[in-house]
């Protein structure tokens, strides 16, 4: 399954890049889930993120590797791919991209590809992930 999100924000490219840290990661967790951040290296190629997440009392491991990252004067992006995923996920690839619109605004886009143990689960999770 594929998801795509896009938003315009009033911040510079560097300001947005600086905000991609542990604090932001924890703020973005869904309210109904528990999340423990065990390791956060950053957003550059070769970095890793290790999580324990799920419903309270039922945490599962999620390990993502940053498999690609690049920056130019007008764009910054990185890709995280799930290496250890909680059930029911079997595949996860998330491309984070920030493009400069002006000195004070950028477009942030997220392209997510994921797979589950069945097509039915893919479709059922599409709504909550969206």
PLM regions and their residue ranges:
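Hydrophobic ligand-binding cavity/cleft-lining segments
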Residues: 1-48
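Beta-strand/loop substructures that line and gate deep hydrophobic ligand-binding cavities in soluble
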Residues: 81-130
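A general secondary-structure boundary signal
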Residues: 6-8, 20, 76-82, 108-113
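Short acidic, gly/pro-rich beta-turn/loop elements at beta-sheet edges
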Residues: 15-17, 28, 59-61, 88-90, ...
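Solvent-exposed residues in well-ordered beta-strands and their adjoining turns
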Residues: 8-12, 52-56, 67, 99-101, ...
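Short, surface-exposed coil-to-beta transition loops
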Residues: 2-4, 59-65, 90-95
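Glycine-rich portal/gate segments that line the openings of hydrophobic small-molecule binding cavities
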Residues: 24-27, 36-86
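A short, structured loop/turn motif at beta-sheet edges
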Residues: 10-14, 42, 67-75, 97-107
């Amino acid at each position: 399954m594929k998801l795509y999100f896009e938003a315009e924000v009033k911040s510079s490219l560097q300001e947005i890049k600086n905000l991609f840290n542990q604090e932001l990661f924890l703020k973005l967790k869904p309210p109904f889930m528990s999340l423990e951040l065990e390791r956060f290296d950053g957003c550059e190629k070769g970095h890793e993120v290790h999580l324990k997440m799920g419903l309270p009392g039922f945490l599962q491991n999620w390990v993502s590797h940053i498999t690609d990252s690049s920056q130019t004067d007008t764009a910054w992006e990185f890709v995280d791919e799930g290496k250890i995923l909680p059930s029911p996920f079997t595949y996860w690839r998330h491309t984070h991209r920030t493009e400069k619109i002006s000195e004070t605004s950028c477009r942030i886009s997220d392209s997510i590809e994921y797979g589950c143990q069945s097509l039915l689960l893919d479709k059922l999770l599409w709504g909550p992930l969206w």
